[in-house]
């Protein structure tokens, strides 16, 4: 049968070559034979025909698959350039084009190396980093963010956006934490779903990363993570589960690290069982770049597209990738029968499904880029994500009408934060620095600047920089120190971790000296990570401002001036010292490991779960964030006292803005199990709601919790289990600021 089909195809090819001028007639003939590109193209575009509208995407995929040669199938399973995988031109199947990253579309990269292409039309809007988005505690804003970045990806003709990142914040030293959504799996789950839906409504696939347990950059390419099943399912997988089941993500990126001795980009348990079987994921698994290590492992254990640089650079650029693991060696294993072609077909089906959802979706919009709406979304996310940690004597807001001399000290007041950081580096259409934003908003003030420290080589000594800063501070009515971390390697940057919790470049000393010269000082921290603050009791205010993207300076000025009332909440805890963090409490085998393996000895007690359960007071707690107003939560109650397994818990409350300014508060609901038979955290976030209220206004709100959300992963049955008996419900405005405690029972 195969020989007859091959003969038929060869005859048809000859027919085409000899009768080109009769191509239309030939195409009709070929269509009737169901063997040509025109037939496959009609299958692809059949949604435009009433007669074939009922034909499902899956039947189209099967029809196209039947027309593909073995070599064509293989070609779709690996890259053809740094950021694309090949199509099948003869069948009208287009290429797939991918792009970093989660908070902006990366500038164009050369076909076969990592140099930038030097285009003049690849400038984009830089959105705030995902730590900032998570700090908004605002799912609606997450959807606006995803929609906007999806529009920019679509305009740049990208089919797959390599983001969002949702790895759990386990250690404050992780160089890539700024790309993720914090330490709590529930918060990350709630925030990631609308982001994905926003991206994909543009016909662009979200590629959720990095699956899984990629919680540090140090030794990320090989470190083997050992963690309990319970911690895996309760802490490190829930956000990915939400991305797949509620967000309906079209692609997932495997991580570099190993888990239980197997690389995660081709992992039997993670990809074949959990993702594709248990969760019924029908999308594409894409390797992290260079994260593939074995043809057999990749073929058999769930990887669909291998991405990364070519292994063989001695051939033409388009052929260089054939030498990669899912290239020629995969082809030979299928030809020999060592690997069943059905395994290959499953990969190709998934890739075709992705293509149908993206580049072959004729209804997808054209996209937009660098428009005012995107700038507005970026600014809104930035202002809502800024977290006011401390505000002694109402230091903020500052009155823009007042004639003040303001000393702005610190390199981060002028340093670009859209460049650097690794693969998330951006080529922003514009970037307003904090100093620019302040000068624009505070036109009546005299703003004087001194760098104070430098992260780069300079002809000034650090002592000279400090001396100049102290002189500047002494001349001012107040000091705004704008420092923190940056995107340099060893700070908030891919491929390396920080070495310590303290601020770099002698900033702790500088802040202490500035306070002595001018005690009227506020500190603005730019970072995606927690830092230690030995000077915290000596300064008036501390504000966490993250990496805010194009609108950074405007957003900071909005909040400092009081144009926007801060409402951000911390998505991770700030420990007093490094050993207060759960990953570091257990020594180097827990973090960073011994160079080969690390053991997650903190198990399920990550972040605030550790602080609360072990009664270790953090510097600033998860969920903490101040406002220029004050809010009161009253009349807190549950709808029942006793619940059945299929019930939902409804927590109602009254929220009143008792301050003089309009603002927003995030009411947070935590739940803990009383007298549990297994180890459990004192409390876990199970619900939250952000509410905007005018000064003096009051509203009645409610938060619903599904009983199933009270379950734990029971390793004895390898499944979720719910304990009956008493539970404690904590309602407040932060994990350590609880307004009322309720007791309920589950029968």
Where are these regions (language model features)?
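Short beta-strand elements
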Residues: 738-747
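Bacterial Sec-dependent N-terminal signal peptides
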Residues: 1-47
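Glycoside hydrolase catalytic-domain context in secreted enzymes
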Residues: 41-712, 719-736
């Amino acid at each position: 049968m195969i020989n007859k089909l091959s003969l038929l195809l060869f005859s048809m090819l000859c027919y085409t070559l000899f009768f080109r001028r009769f191509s239309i007639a030939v195409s009709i003939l070929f269509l009737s034979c169901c063997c040509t590109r025109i037939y496959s193209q009609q299958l692809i575009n059949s949604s435009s025909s009433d007669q074939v509208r009922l034909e499902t995407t899956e039947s189209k995929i099967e029809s196209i698959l039947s027309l593909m040669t073995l070599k064509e199938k293989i070609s779709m399973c690996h890259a053809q350039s740094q950021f694309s995988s090949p199509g099948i031109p003869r069948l009208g199947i287009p290429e797939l084009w991918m792009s970093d990253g989660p908070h902006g579309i990366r500038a164009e990269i050369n076909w076969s190396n990592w140099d930038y292409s030097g285009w003049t039309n690849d400038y984009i809007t830089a959105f705030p980093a995902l730590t900032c988005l998570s700090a908004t505690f605002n799912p609606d804003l997450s959807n606006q963010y995803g929609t906007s970045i999806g529009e920019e990806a679509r305009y740049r003709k990208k089919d797959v956006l390599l983001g969002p990142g949702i790895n759990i914040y386990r250690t404050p030293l992780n160089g890539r934490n700024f790309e993720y959504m914090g330490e709590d799996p529930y918060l990350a789950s709630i925030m990631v779903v609308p982001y994905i839906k926003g991206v994909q409504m543009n016909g662009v696939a979200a590629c959720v990363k990095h699956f899984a347990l990629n919680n540090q950059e140090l030794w990320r390419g090989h470190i083997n993570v050992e963690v309990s099943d319970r911690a895996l399912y309760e802490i490190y997988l829930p956000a990915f589960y939400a991305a797949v089941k509620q967000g309906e993500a079209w692609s997932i990126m495997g991580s570099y690290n190993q888990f239980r001795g197997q690389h995660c980009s081709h992992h039997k348990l993670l990809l074949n069982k959990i993702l594709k079987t248990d969760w019924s994921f029908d999308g594409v698994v894409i390797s992290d770049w260079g994260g593939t290590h074995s043809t057999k492992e990749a073929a058999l254990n769930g990887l669909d597209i291998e991405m990364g640089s070519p292994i063989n650079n001695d051939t033409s650029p388009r052929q260089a990738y054939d030498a990669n693991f899912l290239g020629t060696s995969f082809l030979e294993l299928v030809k020999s029968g060592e690997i069943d072609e059905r395994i290959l077909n499953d990969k190709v089906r998934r890739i075709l499904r992705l293509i149908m959802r993206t580049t072959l979706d004729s209804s997808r919009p054209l996209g937009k880029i660098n428009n005012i709406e995107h700038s507005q979304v970026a600014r809104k996310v930035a202002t809502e994500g800024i977290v006011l940690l401390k505000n002694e004597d109402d230091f903020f807001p500052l009155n823009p009408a007042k004639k003040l001399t303001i000393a702005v000290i610190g390199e981060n007041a002028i340093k670009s934060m859209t460049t650097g950081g690794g693969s998330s580096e951006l080529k922003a259409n514009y970037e307003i620095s904090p100093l620019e934003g302040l000068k624009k908003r505070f036109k009546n003030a005299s703003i004087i600047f001194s760098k104070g420290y430098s992260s780069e080589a300079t002809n000034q000594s650090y002592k000279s920089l400090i001396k100049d800063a102290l002189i500047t501070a002494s001349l001012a009515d107040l000091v705004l120190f704008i420092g923190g971390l940056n995107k340099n390697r060893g700070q908030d940057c891919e491929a390396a971790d920080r070495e310590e919790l303290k601020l770099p470049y002698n900033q702790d000393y500088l802040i202490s000296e500035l306070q002595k010269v001018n005690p009227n000082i506020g500190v603005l921290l730019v970072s995606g990570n927690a830092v230690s603050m030995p000077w915290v009791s000596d300064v008036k205010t501390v504000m966490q401002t993250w990496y805010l993207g194009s609108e950074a300076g405007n957003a900071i000025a909005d909040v400092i001036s009081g144009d926007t009332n801060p409402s951000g909440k911390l998505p991770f805890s700030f420990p007093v010292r490094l050993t207060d963090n759960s990953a570091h409490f257990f020594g180097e085998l827990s973090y960073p490991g011994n160079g080969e393996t690390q053991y997650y000895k903190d198990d399920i007690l990550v972040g605030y779960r550790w602080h609360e359960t072990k009664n270790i007071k953090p510097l600033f707690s998860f969920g903490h964030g101040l406002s220029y107003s004050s809010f009161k939560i009253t009349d807190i109650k549950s709808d029942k006292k006793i619940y059945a397994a299929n019930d939902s818990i409804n927590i109602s409350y009254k929220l009143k803005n008792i301050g003089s300014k309009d603002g927003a508060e995030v009411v947070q609901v935590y739940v803990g199990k009383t007298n549990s038979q297994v180890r459990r955290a004192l409390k876990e976030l199970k619900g939250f709601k952000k509410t905007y209220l005018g000064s003096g206004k009051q509203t009645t709100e409610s938060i619903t919790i599904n009983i199933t959300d009270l379950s734990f992963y029971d390793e004895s049955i390898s499944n979720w289990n719910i304990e009956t008996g008493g539970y404690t419900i904590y309602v407040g405005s932060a994990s350590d600021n609880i307004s009322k405690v309720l007791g309920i029972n589950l029968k």
